[in-house]
Protein backbone atom coordinates (compact mmCIF):
# COMPACT_ATOMS: atom_id res chain seq x y z
CA UNK A 1 0.00 0.00 0.00
CA UNK A 2 1.37 3.41 -1.01
CA UNK A 3 1.23 6.00 1.73
CA UNK A 4 -0.04 9.48 0.90
CA UNK A 5 2.52 12.14 1.81
CA UNK A 6 1.36 14.66 4.38
CA UNK A 7 2.21 18.31 3.89
CA UNK A 8 1.50 20.16 7.16
CA UNK A 9 2.22 23.55 5.59
CA UNK A 10 -0.29 22.96 2.77
CA UNK A 11 -2.87 21.69 5.24
CA UNK A 12 -2.42 24.83 7.33
CA UNK A 13 -2.93 27.05 4.27
CA UNK A 14 -6.08 25.16 3.30
CA UNK A 15 -7.42 25.50 6.84
CA UNK A 16 -6.73 29.23 6.87
CA UNK A 17 -8.37 29.75 3.48
CA UNK A 18 -11.42 27.79 4.64
CA UNK A 19 -11.61 29.94 7.79
CA UNK A 20 -11.44 33.16 5.77
CA UNK A 21 -14.11 31.89 3.38
CA UNK A 22 -16.34 31.04 6.35
CA UNK A 23 -15.84 34.54 7.79
CA UNK A 24 -16.76 36.10 4.44
CA UNK A 25 -19.86 33.88 4.28
CA UNK A 26 -20.89 34.96 7.79
CA UNK A 27 -20.77 38.63 6.86
CA UNK A 28 -22.49 37.89 3.53
CA UNK A 29 -25.39 36.38 5.49
CA UNK A 30 -25.42 39.47 7.71
CA UNK A 31 -25.58 41.76 4.67
CA UNK A 32 -28.34 39.70 3.07
CA UNK A 33 -30.41 39.79 6.25
CA UNK A 34 -29.80 43.51 6.69
CA UNK A 35 -30.91 44.23 3.13
CA UNK A 36 -34.01 42.04 3.47
CA UNK A 37 -34.89 43.68 6.79
CA UNK A 38 -34.58 47.18 5.34
CA UNK A 39 -36.49 46.39 2.16
CA UNK A 40 -39.32 44.69 4.05
CA UNK A 41 -39.61 47.34 6.75
CA UNK A 42 -39.93 50.28 4.34
CA UNK A 43 -43.36 49.36 2.90
CA UNK A 44 -44.57 48.13 6.29
CA UNK A 45 -43.70 51.48 7.87
CA UNK A 46 -45.64 53.29 5.13
CA UNK A 47 -48.65 51.00 5.60
CA UNK A 48 -48.50 51.51 9.36
CA UNK A 49 -48.49 55.30 8.96
CA UNK A 50 -51.41 55.33 6.54
CA UNK A 51 -53.39 52.96 8.76
CA UNK A 52 -52.87 55.40 11.65
CA UNK A 53 -54.05 58.31 9.48
CA UNK A 54 -57.16 56.39 8.45
CA UNK A 55 -57.92 55.47 12.06
CA UNK A 56 -57.83 59.13 13.03
CA UNK A 57 -60.04 60.18 10.12
CA UNK A 58 -62.50 57.35 10.61
CA UNK A 59 -62.72 57.59 14.39
CA UNK A 60 -66.50 57.89 14.20
CA UNK A 61 -66.96 55.50 11.31
CA UNK A 62 -68.84 52.21 11.28
CA UNK A 63 -67.41 49.78 13.89
CA UNK A 64 -66.73 47.20 11.17
CA UNK A 65 -64.36 49.66 9.44
CA UNK A 66 -62.60 50.35 12.72
CA UNK A 67 -62.17 46.61 13.32
CA UNK A 68 -60.78 46.21 9.81
CA UNK A 69 -58.22 48.97 10.37
CA UNK A 70 -57.28 47.49 13.76
CA UNK A 71 -56.75 44.15 12.03
CA UNK A 72 -54.49 45.80 9.47
CA UNK A 73 -52.44 47.46 12.22
CA UNK A 74 -52.17 44.16 14.10
CA UNK A 75 -51.04 42.33 10.98
CA UNK A 76 -48.38 44.94 10.31
CA UNK A 77 -47.12 44.72 13.90
CA UNK A 78 -46.92 40.93 13.58
CA UNK A 79 -44.87 41.23 10.39
CA UNK A 80 -42.48 43.69 12.04
CA UNK A 81 -42.06 41.32 15.00
CA UNK A 82 -41.35 38.47 12.57
CA UNK A 83 -38.64 40.55 10.90
CA UNK A 84 -37.12 41.24 14.33
CA UNK A 85 -37.05 37.53 15.21
CA UNK A 86 -36.10 35.96 11.89
CA UNK A 87 -33.94 38.58 10.18
CA UNK A 88 -32.49 40.88 12.84
CA UNK A 89 -31.79 38.51 15.74
CA UNK A 90 -29.33 36.26 13.81
CA UNK A 91 -27.22 39.34 12.98
CA UNK A 92 -26.30 39.96 16.62
CA UNK A 93 -22.91 38.22 16.41
CA UNK A 94 -21.67 40.43 13.55
CA UNK A 95 -23.56 43.66 14.23
CA UNK A 96 -20.70 45.07 16.30
CA UNK A 97 -17.25 44.36 14.86
CA UNK A 98 -14.65 44.89 17.56
CA UNK A 99 -11.04 45.29 16.51
CA UNK A 100 -7.80 44.86 18.41
CA UNK A 101 -5.29 47.34 17.03
CA UNK A 102 -1.64 46.47 17.50
CA UNK A 103 1.51 47.49 15.61
CA UNK A 104 2.77 45.07 12.96
CA UNK A 105 4.94 45.02 9.85
CA UNK A 106 2.88 45.47 6.69
CA UNK A 107 5.01 43.59 4.16
CA UNK A 108 4.79 40.13 5.80
CA UNK A 109 1.00 40.48 5.97
CA UNK A 110 0.83 41.28 2.26
CA UNK A 111 3.24 38.48 1.30
CA UNK A 112 1.32 35.93 3.39
CA UNK A 113 -2.06 36.98 1.98
CA UNK A 114 -0.88 36.91 -1.63
CA UNK A 115 0.68 33.48 -1.12
CA UNK A 116 -2.53 32.17 0.44
CA UNK A 117 -4.74 33.41 -2.41
CA UNK A 118 -2.40 31.97 -5.04
CA UNK A 119 -2.23 28.61 -3.26
CA UNK A 120 -5.92 28.32 -2.42
CA UNK A 121 -7.48 29.47 -5.71
CA UNK A 122 -5.52 31.57 -8.21
CA UNK A 123 -3.04 28.89 -9.31
CA UNK A 124 -5.81 26.33 -9.79
CA UNK A 125 -7.83 28.86 -11.80
CA UNK A 126 -4.75 29.82 -13.88
CA UNK A 127 -5.18 33.44 -12.84
CA UNK A 128 -1.99 35.38 -12.15
CA UNK A 129 -1.68 38.13 -9.55
CA UNK A 130 0.66 41.06 -10.20
CA UNK A 131 1.51 42.84 -6.97
CA UNK A 132 3.01 46.27 -6.38
CA UNK A 133 4.04 46.50 -2.75
CA UNK A 134 5.36 49.41 -0.69
CA UNK A 135 9.11 49.89 -0.42
CA UNK A 136 11.02 49.68 2.82
CA UNK A 137 9.56 48.21 6.00
CA UNK A 138 6.30 50.09 6.61
CA UNK A 139 4.23 49.27 9.66
CA UNK A 140 0.62 49.76 10.75
CA UNK A 141 -1.27 49.88 13.99
CA UNK A 142 -4.43 47.95 13.20
CA UNK A 143 -6.15 44.59 13.61
CA UNK A 144 -3.82 42.38 11.60
CA UNK A 145 -6.10 39.35 11.37
CA UNK A 146 -9.16 41.36 10.28
CA UNK A 147 -7.12 43.19 7.64
CA UNK A 148 -5.78 39.86 6.40
CA UNK A 149 -9.36 38.58 6.07
CA UNK A 150 -10.42 41.70 4.17
CA UNK A 151 -7.47 41.60 1.76
CA UNK A 152 -7.93 37.87 1.18
CA UNK A 153 -11.62 38.42 0.43
CA UNK A 154 -10.86 41.24 -2.02
CA UNK A 155 -8.22 39.22 -3.88
CA UNK A 156 -10.24 36.01 -3.88
CA UNK A 157 -13.30 37.84 -5.21
CA UNK A 158 -11.19 39.22 -8.05
CA UNK A 159 -9.85 35.76 -8.86
CA UNK A 160 -13.39 34.32 -8.77
CA UNK A 161 -14.46 36.94 -11.33
CA UNK A 162 -11.51 36.31 -13.67
CA UNK A 163 -11.35 33.93 -16.60
CA UNK A 164 -8.43 31.51 -16.93
CA UNK A 165 -5.33 33.24 -18.25
CA UNK A 166 -6.42 36.64 -16.99
CA UNK A 167 -4.48 38.83 -14.60
CA UNK A 168 -5.44 40.42 -11.29
CA UNK A 169 -3.46 43.45 -10.16
CA UNK A 170 -2.87 44.33 -6.54
CA UNK A 171 -1.31 47.56 -5.32
CA UNK A 172 -0.74 48.65 -1.74
CA UNK A 173 0.55 52.05 -0.70
CA UNK A 174 1.30 53.69 2.62
CA UNK A 175 1.01 57.41 2.12
CA UNK A 176 1.30 59.60 5.17
CA UNK A 177 -1.42 58.71 7.64
CA UNK A 178 -3.26 56.28 5.35
CA UNK A 179 -2.68 52.81 3.97
CA UNK A 180 -4.61 51.87 0.82
CA UNK A 181 -5.02 48.62 -1.11
CA UNK A 182 -6.43 48.36 -4.63
CA UNK A 183 -7.40 45.16 -6.46
CA UNK A 184 -8.33 45.30 -10.16
CA UNK A 185 -9.73 42.56 -12.38
CA UNK A 186 -11.73 41.98 -15.54
CA UNK A 187 -15.12 40.41 -14.84
CA UNK A 188 -16.23 37.22 -16.58
CA UNK A 189 -19.79 36.13 -15.82
CA UNK A 190 -18.99 32.73 -17.32
CA UNK A 191 -16.08 32.23 -14.93
CA UNK A 192 -18.27 33.14 -11.97
CA UNK A 193 -20.97 30.69 -13.01
CA UNK A 194 -18.87 27.74 -14.26
CA UNK A 195 -19.42 24.83 -11.81
CA UNK A 196 -16.42 22.97 -13.27
CA UNK A 197 -13.99 25.59 -11.96
CA UNK A 198 -12.68 25.60 -8.39
CA UNK A 199 -14.41 28.23 -6.25
CA UNK A 200 -13.92 29.71 -2.79
CA UNK A 201 -17.45 31.15 -2.57
CA UNK A 202 -20.76 29.39 -3.16
CA UNK A 203 -22.93 29.86 -6.24
CA UNK A 204 -25.35 32.23 -4.49
CA UNK A 205 -22.53 34.59 -3.49
CA UNK A 206 -21.10 34.59 -7.01
CA UNK A 207 -24.47 35.24 -8.64
CA UNK A 208 -25.22 38.07 -6.24
CA UNK A 209 -22.01 39.85 -7.27
CA UNK A 210 -23.53 40.52 -10.70
CA UNK A 211 -26.84 41.83 -9.35
CA UNK A 212 -27.67 45.50 -9.95
CA UNK A 213 -27.49 47.50 -6.74
CA UNK A 214 -27.56 50.99 -5.32
CA UNK A 215 -24.16 52.67 -5.67
CA UNK A 216 -23.83 52.87 -1.88
CA UNK A 217 -24.28 49.13 -1.40
CA UNK A 218 -21.44 46.63 -1.77
CA UNK A 219 -21.63 43.11 -3.16
CA UNK A 220 -22.68 40.88 -0.30
CA UNK A 221 -19.56 38.72 -0.53
CA UNK A 222 -17.52 41.88 0.14
CA UNK A 223 -19.49 42.93 3.23
CA UNK A 224 -16.64 41.79 5.48
CA UNK A 225 -14.26 44.19 3.70
CA UNK A 226 -16.59 47.12 4.26
CA UNK A 227 -17.15 46.28 7.93
CA UNK A 228 -13.40 45.88 8.58
CA UNK A 229 -12.64 49.20 6.88
CA UNK A 230 -15.35 51.06 8.81
CA UNK A 231 -14.27 49.50 12.11
CA UNK A 232 -10.80 50.96 11.52
CA UNK A 233 -12.20 54.38 10.59
CA UNK A 234 -11.50 53.77 6.90
CA UNK A 235 -13.41 53.22 3.67
CA UNK A 236 -14.16 50.44 1.21
CA UNK A 237 -15.55 50.90 -2.31
CA UNK A 238 -15.85 48.98 -5.55
CA UNK A 239 -17.28 49.53 -9.01
CA UNK A 240 -20.24 47.50 -10.25
CA UNK A 241 -19.52 43.92 -11.30
CA UNK A 242 -20.75 43.40 -14.86
CA UNK A 243 -19.70 40.95 -17.53
CA UNK A 244 -16.75 42.42 -19.43
CA UNK A 245 -16.22 45.30 -17.01
CA UNK A 246 -12.92 46.18 -15.37
CA UNK A 247 -13.53 46.54 -11.65
CA UNK A 248 -11.35 48.01 -8.92
CA UNK A 249 -11.88 47.25 -5.24
CA UNK A 250 -10.33 49.79 -2.86
CA UNK A 251 -9.79 49.61 0.88
CA UNK A 252 -8.19 52.42 2.88
CA UNK A 253 -7.49 52.53 6.62
CA UNK A 254 -5.58 54.89 8.91
CA UNK A 255 -2.04 53.82 9.67
CA UNK A 256 -2.79 54.38 13.35
CA UNK A 257 -6.22 52.87 13.98
CA UNK A 258 -7.92 53.26 17.34
CA UNK A 259 -8.96 50.18 19.19
Question: What do the PLM-derived regions correspond to, one by one?
Answer:
Residues 55-63:
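Short acidic helix/loop segment immediately C-terminal to the autophosphorylated histidine
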Residues 192-206:
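Short conserved segment of the HATPase_c
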Residues 74-79:
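Short alpha-helical segment of the dimerization/phosphotransfer core of two-component systems
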Residues 100-105, 128-138, 145:
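Conserved catalytic submotifs in the C-terminal HATPase_c
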Residues 100-115, 148:
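A conserved beta-strand-to-alpha-helix junction within the catalytic ATP-binding
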Residues 233-239:
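Glycine-rich ATP-binding loops of the HATPase_c
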Amino acid sequence: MTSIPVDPAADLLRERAAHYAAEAALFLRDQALSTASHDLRSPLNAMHSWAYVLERQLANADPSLQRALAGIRTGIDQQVALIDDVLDAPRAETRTLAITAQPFALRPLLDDTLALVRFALADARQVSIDATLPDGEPSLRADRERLAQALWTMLTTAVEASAAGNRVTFACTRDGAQCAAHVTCGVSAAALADPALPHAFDAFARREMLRSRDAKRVAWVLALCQRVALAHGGTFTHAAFADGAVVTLSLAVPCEAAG
